[in-house]
Swiss-Prot record:
Probable peripherally associated component of the endosomal sorting required for transport complex III (ESCRT-III) which is involved in multivesicular bodies (MVBs) formation and sorting of endosomal cargo proteins into MVBs. MVBs contain intraluminal vesicles (ILVs) that are generated by invagination and scission from the limiting membrane of the endosome and mostly are delivered to lysosomes enabling degradation of membrane proteins, such as stimulated growth factor receptors, lysosomal enzymes and lipids. Residues 167-199 are annotated as: Disordered. Keywords: Coiled coil, Cytoplasm, Endosome, Membrane, Protein transport, Transport. Belongs to the SNF7 family. This is Charged multivesicular body protein 1b. The gene is chmp1b. InterPro entries: Snf7_fam. GO terms for cellular component: cytosol; late endosome membrane.
Amino acid sequence: MSSMEKNLFNLKFAAKELHRNAKKCEKEEKTEKAKIKKAIQKGNTEIARIHAENAIRQKNQGINFLRMSARVDAVAARVQTAVTMGKVTKSMAGVVKSMDTTLKSMNLEKISALMDKFEHQFETLDVQTQQMEDTMSNTTTLTTPQNQVDNLLHEMADEAGLDLNMELPQGQTGSVGTSVASTEQDELSQRLARLRDQV
């Protein structure tokens, strides 16, 4: 097995590993959602909010892993084509030297930078390339939008058949431009609450 074939194998393996990490995040998101329901049932709105933030963070992280998995997979396909056509250049071979440790680290920013180098090599070979995303550092965020948290809390409360009484200051506006969807969601939640009171 040539070093390029070995690196091709590593790329494919990394894509699968990233996909596996996305699945783990999905599982964690479901666990956090179950905890939201329990906290709401006990009337612990603050605890429910923490679990909602965790759930959204896991969801976003999972999406990032999926995106990077697809990107690595696409690069692997291009490497496969280059190997098959015998178009592996010296500069491309140079890029793969740091690949092993980068892929094993599962660090999205480092993998993204490595994919950038690969994609640059393919552009110079006139192999058509399409970047799926900019570096993942822009999308990996530690903060969670409050309207997403509020919507998830309401969604979980509705699924659990409970009324969520959140003390929100009057006239409080959400983060820049509250969406029509969240307003509609609030109206639906209020209607559901009224229907429950009538029963």
